[in-house]
C-alpha cells in the first residue's frame, strides 16, 4: 500500500521554509499531496492557479529526485477531511518554534479525534529557514526589499513582477 502524505498550507508564496519541509517529507512517503487551502474570505497575493504552478515548479523536482510523486491540489474544507479524500495517512506539519508546536499540537489532537487513521508528523525547520514566514516575505517584497534569500529564485522573480506595477 503506498504511503500518502498530505501537506496543507496557503503557500502565498512558497518560501524556502516550505521547501525545507517538502525536502524532509518526501523520503517519508511515496506520494506527497501539497494542498492549498482556499477560503472565500481571504484575499491572497497570488491566485490559486499561480500558487499551484509555483508548487509544481519548485517542489516537483525535489520530490522526483527523492523518488516521490508530488501532487499539488486545492481544498476548501478541513485539512483532515481533505487528507482523507486523498487517501493520506500522514499529515505533514512544519515547526519553526515552540509557538508553532503549541498550536500544531492542538490541531493534531483535534485531527486525531476526527480521523484517527491520519497521523500528524512534525518536521522541525532547518535552522537557516526558521525565521521565514510567507507574511514577512510578502511585506518585505511589497516594500521593495530583497527576498531572494527567503524564497526560491522563481518565486523571487514572481514577487518582483507582482510588485513592479
Curated annotation (Swiss-Prot):
InterPro entries per record: Cyt_trans-like, PPAT, Rossmann-like_a/b/a_fold
Main location: cytoplasm
Keywords: ATP-binding, Coenzyme A biosynthesis, Cytoplasm, Magnesium, Nucleotide-binding, Nucleotidyltransferase, Transferase
Catalytic activity: (R)-4'-phosphopantetheine + ATP + H(+) = 3'-dephospho-CoA + diphosphate
Compartmental location: Cytoplasm
Ligand binding (ATP): 10-11, 18, 94-96, 104, 129-135
Signal peptide stretch: none
One GO CC term on file: cytoplasm
Residues the entry annotates as binding substrate: 10, 42, 79, 93
EC class (word): transferase
Cofactor field: Mg(2+)
GO biological process, one term: coenzyme A biosynthetic process
GO molecular function: ATP binding; pantetheine-phosphate adenylyltransferase activity
Residue(s) at site: Transition state stabilizer: 18
UniProt-listed Enzyme Commission number(s): 2.7.7.3
CDD domains: PPAT
HAMAP family in the cross-refs: PPAT_bact
Record's subunit section: Homohexamer.
Family: Belongs to the bacterial CoaD family.
Function, as annotated: Reversibly transfers an adenylyl group from ATP to 4'-phosphopantetheine, yielding dephospho-CoA (dPCoA) and pyrophosphate.
Name listed for the protein in its UniProt record: Phosphopantetheine adenylyltransferase
Annotated organism of origin: Bradyrhizobium diazoefficiens (strain JCM 10833 / BCRC 13528 / IAM 13628 / NBRC 14792 / USDA 110)
Amino acid at each position: 500500500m503506498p504511503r500518502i502524505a498530505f501537506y496543507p498550507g496557503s503557500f502565498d508564496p512558497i518560501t524556502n521554509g516550505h521547501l525545507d519541509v517538502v525536502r524532509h517529507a518526501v523520503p517519508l512517503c511515496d506520494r506527497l499531496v501539497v494542498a492549498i487551502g482556499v477560503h472565500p474570505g481571504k484575499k491572497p497575493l497570488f491566485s490559486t492557479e499561480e500558487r499551484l504552478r509555483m508548487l509544481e515548479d519548485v517542489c516537483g523536482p525535489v520530490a522526483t529526485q527523492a523518488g516521490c510523486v508530488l501532487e499539488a491540489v486545492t481544498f476548501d474544507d478541513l485539512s483532515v477531511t481533505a487528507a482523507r479524500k486523498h487517501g493520506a495517512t500522514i499529515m505533514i506539519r512544519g515547526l519553526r518554534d515552540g509557538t508553532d508546536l503549541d498550536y500544531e499540537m492542538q490541531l493534531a489532537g483535534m485531527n486525531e479525534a476526527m480521523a484517527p487513521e491520519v497521523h500528524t508528523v512534525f518536521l522541525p525547520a532547518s535552522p537557516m529557514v526558521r525565521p521565514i514566514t510567507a507574511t514577512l516575505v510578502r511585506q518585505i517584497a511589497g516594500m521593495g526589499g530583497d527576498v531572494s534569500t527567503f524564497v526560491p529564485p522563481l518565486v523571487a522573480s514572481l514577487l518582483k513582477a507582482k510588485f513592479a506595477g
